């Protein structure tokens, strides 16, 4: 609903890619991008990572993708800084400037937006600031800060599952989404927040050291 309604609101045209970020399927995405020059391009981080080797060696693909492009958007997972910088390099080499890269954060239960980046940023991982009408609360959870969200976009609960609904909301009515975040700049909250993995997937080693899976996954990839 986010992408469709944004397109309708601005009188645009929406193209649905039949390709996927998987071996044997990313080639369809490459072929599609040679036919269509988007003004806004949406993909998940894995999609960009699989697309990059083609962009780096295929001039026709680069020219088609960047010709009219205003925004590269990603969500659903963390984009690595390496992929961010490689995308910037291809943009600069093709059209002489960096295309604005932005991200958002949310879940199905939040319909789906909670935060958005709406200004130029210089690094991967920033998920922006709360959208109008939405409140975020950062709650200490072990050694991280858990994000909780409240607003008109948040589901009132799970159909016929009062047990799940009760467990999903805190005493202030904030939805406990299970993700973690931190400020991009502790002294300047307006610079946005950074996605910091999940709080529920972390575990402790026998040495007593916490392993933060989200951060580890980003570094390994």
Predicted regions and their residues:
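Short, solvent-exposed loop/turn segments at the edges of secondary structure
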Residues: 2, 7-9, 67, 131, ...
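Phosphate/diphosphate-binding loops
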Residues: 215
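Conserved adenylate-forming
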Residues: 19-143
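Conserved ATP-binding/catalytic segment of the ANL
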Residues: 140, 145-205
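Short, surface-exposed basic-aromatic patches at helix termini and helix-loop junctions that form
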Residues: 6-9, 89-94, 167, 221
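Structured core elements
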Residues: 15-16, 42, 73, 102-103, ...
């Amino acid at each position: 609903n986010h992408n469709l309604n944004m397109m309708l609101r601005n009188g645009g045209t929406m193209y649905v890619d039949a390709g996927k970020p998987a071996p044997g399927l990313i080639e369809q995405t490459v072929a599609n991008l040679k036919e269509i020059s988007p003004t806004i391009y949406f993909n998940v981080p894995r999609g960009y990572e699989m697309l990059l080797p083609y962009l780096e060696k295929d001039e026709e693909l680069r020219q088609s993708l960047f010709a009219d492009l205003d925004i590269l958007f990603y969500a659903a997972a963390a984009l690595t800084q390496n992929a961010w910088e490689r995308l910037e390099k291809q943009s600069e080499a093709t059209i002489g400037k960096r295309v604005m890269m932005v991200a958002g954060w949310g879940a199905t239960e939040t319909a789906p937006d909670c935060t958005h980046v709406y200004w130029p940023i210089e690094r991967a991982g920033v998920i922006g600031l709360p959208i109008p009408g939405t409140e975020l609360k950062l709650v200490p959870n072990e050694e991280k800060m858990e994000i909780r969200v409240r607003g008109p976009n948040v589901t009132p609960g799970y159909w016929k599952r009062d047990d799940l609904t009760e467990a999903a909301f805190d005493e202030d009515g904030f939805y406990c989404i299970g993700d973690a975040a931190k400020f991009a700049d502790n002294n300047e909250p307006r610079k946005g927040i950074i996605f910091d993995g999940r709080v529920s997937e972390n575990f402790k080693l026998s040495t007593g050291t916490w392993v933060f899976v989200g951060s580890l996954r980003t570094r390994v990839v």
